[in-house]
Amino acid sequence: MANIKSQIKRNKTNEKARLRNQAVRSAVRTEIRKFNAAIEAGDKDAAQAQLRTASRALDKAVTKGVFHINNAANKKSNMATAFNKLG
């Protein structure tokens, strides 16, 4: 347990940020999971809609500082490749 006042404050701030980041990360993972389910089902229209929402969620997460921009770009690229393979 921290004794220094500034570190006690930082611990509170870090915990709030951790919970916020966890929620955003979970939401992004859910969108990617929905996209993968649409790909597995072979539903091109649903996959296209999910690709759009998942990409949007990733971009928002980058803006909030949860994901690095290159990490999000790689995830979007992998999803686009999977979508294009769907035919």
Curated annotation (Swiss-Prot):
GO terms for molecular function: small ribosomal subunit rRNA binding; structural constituent of ribosome. Residues 1-22 are annotated as: Disordered. GO terms for biological process: translation. One of its GO terms (cellular component) is cytosol. Keywords: Ribonucleoprotein, Ribosomal protein, RNA-binding, rRNA-binding. It holds the Pfam family Ribosomal_S20p. Belongs to the bacterial ribosomal protein bS20 family. Binds directly to 16S ribosomal RNA. This is Small ribosomal subunit protein bS20.
